[in-house]
A protein has these predicted regions:
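Catalytic-loop of the protein kinase fold
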Residues: 178-180, 185
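Conserved protein kinase catalytic-loop anchor
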Residues: 176-178, 196
Length: 305
């Protein structure tokens, strides 16, 4: 039975065509209509194992766990565990724009309001009781991204070894929370200045809240992305975003986590550039990355000097 037939049978309604959803989604992601309702369907690609980013059942579980919380997420409508597994969720209205990286016509004032609202949504996320999973601490995060960095050719990561030595002085962990893993405006849908849904839960985990926070702050300043970023006047500073997130309670050791996020971004970009140059994923835009990779490593090192 085709995926479309399985979805229609589970919903008990005839559906329209499964149309691929544009954007950088893992697995197979479609939109479809059933009557007046629109849905998003995520499925494991045929022949692939439901692990990592393709473990869509794990994504469905966390969306269901967050239903009714102060974190806006699409409602899960149906889940089918039969291989290849899939689930259907509500189509969340809104737009997801990364102000300093995406081409857009968003007013700077609205971009700033959205960043402050996202900081509050992140705080709400970290106040949700985490699922009963083994937490990944700061040391585990460092180990994971160190492996990725070491897979990048040395000439693409100048200064990385010095940075990794500095990062080896790992701070103690805060109590574990639910971590989104890629929390930024590009993964939060907005209607005006109101967050309508946090999406793309492929790499959620239980861990230190500062992992999410450091990553989110990275996208507040175009200067972090030489040759890629665009100035957006009036965006909140990192200090203003931290205040929106933490209120009166200071978050310790953020300097280390801001450096970790830069190392992580450099490792991801270096990995993508290597794949392009090896012919594994043709994308000429990857050739724009070296200045940002170098800047990420340099500024991370400066943070820990």
């Amino acid at each position: 039975m085709s995926l479309a037939a399985r979805v229609a049978a589970r919903l008990g309604l005839p559906i329209g065509e499964l149309e691929p959803l544009p954007g950088g989604h893992s697995g197979l992601t479609y939109t479809t209509k059933a009557g007046v309702h629109q849905y998003v369907v995520k499925a494991v690609p045929p022949g692939q194992k439901p692990v990592g980013r393709n473990d869509i059942l794990r994504q469905a579980r966390i969306l269901r766990a967050l239903a009714g919380s102060r974190v806006p997420v699409p409602g899960v409508i149906a889940v089918d565990e039969q291989a290849p597994a899939w689930f259907a969720m509500e189509f969340a209205e809104g737009e997801a724009i990364e102000p300093v990286l995406d081409a857009h016509t968003l007013a700077p004032e609205l971009a700033g309001s959205r960043m402050l609202e996202a900081a509050r949504v992140l705080r709400n996320l970290h106040e949700v009781a985490p699922p009963p999973e083994a937490p990944i601490g700061a040391a585990g995060e460092l180990e994971r991204w160190t492996r990725t960095m070491h897979a990048v050719p040395a000439e693409l990561r100048p200064g990385a070894e010095d940075l990794l030595k500095r990062l080896a002085d790992v701070p103690g962990d805060l109590p574990p929370v639910l971590v989104h893993g890629d929390f930024r405006l590009g993964n939060v849908l907005f209607a005006g200045d109101r967050a309508s849904a946090v999406v793309d839960w492929e790499i959620w985990s239980v861990g230190d809240p500062r992992v999410d926070l450091g990553w989110f702050l990275l996208f507040a300043d175009h200067r972090n992305f030489p040759a890629l970023g665009t100035p957006v006047p009036g965006l909140p500073t990192e200090s203003e975003l931290l205040h929106a997130y933490q209120g009166k309670h200071a978050v310790p050791e953020m300097r280390w986590f801001r450096a970790l996020s830069r190392m992580k971004m450099a490792a991801i970009m270096g990995h993508n550039l290597r794949r392009h140059r090896e012919g594994k994923h043709h994308d000429p835009d990857q050739e724009r990355l070296p200045p940002t990779i170098a800047a990420m490593i340099r500024t991370a090192t400066d943070l820990l000097a």
